[in-house]
Amino acid sequence: PRIIVEDDIIIFPDSSKYETYNTTGVWEDNFGNYGIMKCLVSQFINSKQEITLDGYCEANDHRKEKFWMSLKRNSFNKAGVGKSKYIFTETKYKTLQGKECPYAAQLIEGGGVFKLKCKITNDEYNILGKQND
């Protein structure tokens, strides 16, 4: 999958830096859903290369159903694992409203991967997975 990244960087005298990204790419979850996600992300990397990342995303799945989420991470620059939170949801994703889920992200040349993995009940799974046929 192709990912578009537009970024801006401020570098401080101690080599720490503040970066912003405007990304669009492909996402998938552990219920069989997938689609396109647009994210606005900021990260601060201190002089010890420790990272604090915050972002907000708008996602459309393969059936044009939407949700919005926040991202937080304190790991690698171009890849890492963090926490996402569903902050607004539509239709079948309403069952995830307010839920926090781990995610993994990896930017690679010419593409990217964003994977959500939520722990949910059987009832929630039936709601989220039943419309994927």
Segments and roles (model prediction):
Residues 1-133:
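Beta-strand-enriched cores of mature, soluble protein domains
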